[in-house]
Swiss-Prot record:
Bias (Polar residues): 204-223
Species of the source: Escherichia coli (strain ATCC 8739 / DSM 1576 / NBRC 3972 / NCIMB 8545 / WDCM 00012 / Crooks)
Upper lineage: Bacteria, Pseudomonadati, Pseudomonadota, Gammaproteobacteria, Enterobacterales
InterPro entries (alphabetical): Biofilm_formation_YgiB
Region (Disordered): 178-223
Biased composition (Low complexity): 178-195
Stored NCBIfam families: PRK11653.1 (NF008655)
Name recorded for this polypeptide: UPF0441 protein YgiB
Family named by the database record: Belongs to the UPF0441 family.
Coiled-coil residue spans: none
């Protein structure tokens, strides 16, 4: 009889442990899953220039200026390049294009047009930039240049888009939004020129991909 009681007590302790530890294990797993989701997204703010950033972040004017200047450099490296001023203006509007030095590796689709532009290419002015929210204690931050089409017929019209054509909504500075961390990653340098209307086509393709990805994610979460 003593042996039977001992076995029953051991069984009770085993079952009790299983019932009470399982919810804890699930809770821990949930925490790790949530942490994974948090790491994949980043909260960013959209500014037109360093002054906008400084006004929104008092005492951080130096950081705002650094981020703005870095975004300008990134824009020069990654912005869509056009062989002629006319092609650039057709997408981004009069007064919104500037001449950019020819970059190593550039391969204009029309070499004659490139020569007409005196060996230089044309690129849109940076319309704004996306910046990782400033953190206390001098934490690091990232920035990404944004462009905006002035052509009503373009899919990019009135939108903030990055160099790859990804759309981040209306071209209105001062907004805060959540984006994938990949959105803040450096973009590849431009190595070819864009034909007239080509950037708008890139934006349309990216929008289709974004909608498709969102739909797939929703279906997965819904089971």
């Amino acid at each position: 009889m003593k042996r039977t009681k001992s076995i029953r007590h051991a069984s009770f302790r085993k079952n009790w442990s299983a019932r009470h530890l399982t919810p804890v294990a699930l809770a821990v797993a949930t925490v790790f899953m949530l942490a994974g989701c948090e790491k994949s997204d980043e909260t960013v703010s959209l500014y037109q220039n360093a002054d906008d950033c400084s006004a929104a972040n008092p005492g951080k004017s130096a950081e705002c200026t650094t981020a703005y200047n870095n975004a300008l450099k990134e824009a020069e490296r990654t912005a869509p390049k056009y062989a002629t001023r006319e092609d650039c203006v057709a997408e981004f509007g009069e007064g919104q294009c500037q001449q950019a030095p020819a970059q190593a590796g550039m391969a204009p689709e029309n070499q004659a047009q490139a020569q007409q532009s005196s060996g230089s290419f044309w690129m849109p002015l940076m319309a704004g930039y996306m910046m990782g929210r400033l953190m206390g204690g001098g934490a690091g931050f990232a920035q990404q240049p944004l462009f905006s089409s002035k052509n009503p017929a373009s899919p990019a019209y009135g939108k903030y888009t990055d160099a790859t054509g990804k759309n981040y909504g209306a071209a209105q500075p001062g907004r805060t939004m959540t984006v994938p961390k990949t959105a803040m990653a450096p973009k590849p340098a431009t190595t070819t020129t864009v034909t007239r209307g080509g950037f708008g086509e890139s934006v349309a393709k990216q929008s289709t991909l974004q909608r498709s990805a969102t739909g797939t994610s929703s279906r997965s979460m819904g089971g």
